[in-house]
Amino acid sequence: MPREIITLQLGQCGNQIGFEFWKQLCAEHGISPEGIVEEFATEGTDRKDVFFYQADDEHYIPRAVLLDLEPRVIHSILNSPYAKLYNPENIYLSEHGGGAGNNWASGFSQGEKIHEDIFDIIDREADGSDSLEGFVLCHSIAGGTGSGLGSYLLERLNDRYPKKLVQTYSVFPNQDEMSDVVVQPYNSLLTLKRLTQNADCVVVLDNTALNRIATDRLHIQNPSFSQINQLVSTIMSASTTTLRYPGYMNNDLIGLIASLIPTPRLHFLMTGYTPLTTDQSVASVRKTTVLDVMRRLLQPKNVMVSTGRDRQTNHCYIAILNIIQGEVDPTQVHKSLQRIRERKLANFIPWGPASIQVALSRKSPYLPSAHRVSGLMMANHTSISSLFERTCRQYDKLRKREAFLEQFRKEDMFKDNFDEMDTSREIVQQLIDEYHAATRPDYISWGTQEQ
């Protein structure tokens, strides 16, 4: 029985990565840009109905809700070849179309005003599912709509659908170059509070690392957003292959999440993908074996989160799930796992078993692939806290000088005080502390003694 998943795309970034994601899914399932199953797509082994449903005339429609406070990106989607794919009733653009001006508070308070319209769409979509498993939210944490409206939606989804899973694909801003959004640290911190408290699982897409991978590995000089978004859609589609081409394990979202998240707050995941090549000539030379793929996944240069090396803390893996696609002999997997353990290629937590799991998944029969085997690693690693520390440092700098707070004062939430920011800062600090605690053997009893 398929457990359906509803995708919510928010703001410029969320809609752009969502668009690439659906493009990729259509290609993998042999669905044309209009939603019609192609003549050649005759294999019935994939489950399309987790992410799509069929309209009366048999064509497939994504279970997606497209939301934005300004029209530009959604209009470009509606002028693309994929315009007819989406259900037009599931597209919401705010009336005045002014956007949230890269301001979290504006996005959040607009959410309060329009929440009935938005939840009409979401509830209708949820009622149309036989057994809804949960929601996937695509957004960025630095702007206004993805962060503010995203935060508002996360809170409301918890109230309205307390038993449903909420997974997010959250894009973190690029730290290598100056941001064009001066209030980015405020936006990020306020969103992080919601991601900590209201999401079950957050897949961190770090623009810093994605840009580095595009330049170093794919040899693109100045990667454009659309090239980065292609990387993101590769990750998103690979992380859902076990749901769409079901095997024995991990064939629903809770199965994926349960194997990676042993303690509820430490639910921020990083991803790695290999082989990353756009260049066909290189691709054909390499022999990709399971061990190759699994070893490469553990190399920092393939991991899509840029974390500083912290000498004081022994950062370690809490859990790893490798999704291996392609022609794989299961005995090879066992050997590779043994090799990784023997050679101690990965450093695991001292308070629990070394949890490294492998899910085997088929590749799409309709896409020619340059590699025999490719792999996605989803890892729960304590060094992700360095990403939050960076956000906190930037936030503290601005907050100390009370810089750029006028834009926030305009909204009711911050009219009298900035308590919301200060509590968010505390919650993110607790999250960082817990990640540090998880590197020590006494983490099991952490939080039980009086501190």
UniProtKB/Swiss-Prot annotation:
Tagged with keyword Phosphoprotein: yes
Record carries keyword Cytoplasm: yes
GO CC term (a single one): polar microtubule
Subcellular localization: Cytoplasm, Cytoskeleton, Microtubule organizing center, Centrosome; Cytoplasm, Cytoskeleton, Spindle
Subunit field text: Component of the gamma-tubulin ring complex (gTuRC) consisting of TUBGCP2, TUBGCP3, TUBGCP4, TUBGCP5 and TUBGCP6 and gamma-tubulin TUBG1 or TUBG2. TUBGCP2, TUBGCP3, TUBGCP4, TUBGCP5 and TUBGCP6 assemble in a 5:5:2:1:1 stoichiometry; each is associated with a gamma-tubulin, thereby arranging 14 gamma-tubulins in a helical manner. Gamma-tubulin at the first position is blocked by TUBGCP3 at the last position, allowing 13 protafilaments to grow into a microtubule.
Disease annotated for this entry: Cortical dysplasia, complex, with other brain malformations 4: A disorder of aberrant neuronal migration and disturbed axonal guidance. Clinical features include early-onset seizures, microcephaly, spastic tetraplegia, and various malformations of cortical development, such as agyria, posterior or frontal pachygyria, thick cortex, and subcortical band heterotopia and thin corpus callosum in some patients.
Family from the record: Belongs to the tubulin family.
Protein name according to UniProt: Tubulin gamma-1 chain
